[in-house]
Amino acid sequence: MSGNTGERPFADIITSIRYWVIHSITIPSLFIAGWLFVSTGLAYDVFGTPRPNEYFTENRQEVPLITDRFNSLEQIESYTKSI
């Protein structure tokens, strides 16, 4: 025998007008905020990733791969100096 937890059934929640009034505003605004976050380039600044035109510089046209496991710090420093 199961008890009642006092919560509203999910079907009642998604069929209520109040739910759709709130979510018809919040869902599109979250989508627009995410689109603006990415399209303005703020995502690159926040997460520190290079922009698509910054992957290869004029001085360095090869892919910066770490090949020597024991001297990896020196390789990383040489790659970051050329940026």
From Swiss-Prot:
GO molecular function: electron transfer activity; heme binding; iron ion binding
Annotated Gene3D superfamilies: Photosystem II cytochrome b559, alpha subunit
Top-level taxon in the UniProt lineage: Eukaryota
Gene Ontology biological-process entries: photosynthetic electron transport chain
Membrane topology: Single-pass membrane protein
Places the protein is found: Plastid, Chloroplast thylakoid membrane
Names of the cofactor(s): heme b
Record-listed heme binding positions: 23
Keyword annotations of the record: Chloroplast, Electron transport, Heme, Iron, Membrane, Metal-binding, Photosynthesis, Photosystem II, Plastid, Thylakoid, Transmembrane, Transmembrane helix, Transport
Regions that span the bilayer: 21-35
Subunit structure: Heterodimer of an alpha subunit and a beta subunit. PSII is composed of 1 copy each of membrane proteins PsbA, PsbB, PsbC, PsbD, PsbE, PsbF, PsbH, PsbI, PsbJ, PsbK, PsbL, PsbM, PsbT, PsbX, PsbY, PsbZ, Psb30/Ycf12, at least 3 peripheral proteins of the oxygen-evolving complex and a large number of cofactors. It forms dimeric complexes.
Biological role stated in the UniProt entry: This b-type cytochrome is tightly associated with the reaction center of photosystem II (PSII). PSII is a light-driven water:plastoquinone oxidoreductase that uses light energy to abstract electrons from H(2)O, generating O(2) and a proton gradient subsequently used for ATP formation. It consists of a core antenna complex that captures photons, and an electron transfer chain that converts photonic excitation into a charge separation.
Similarity annotation: Belongs to the PsbE/PsbF family.
The protein's name in its UniProt record: Cytochrome b559 subunit alpha
Protein species of origin: Chara vulgaris
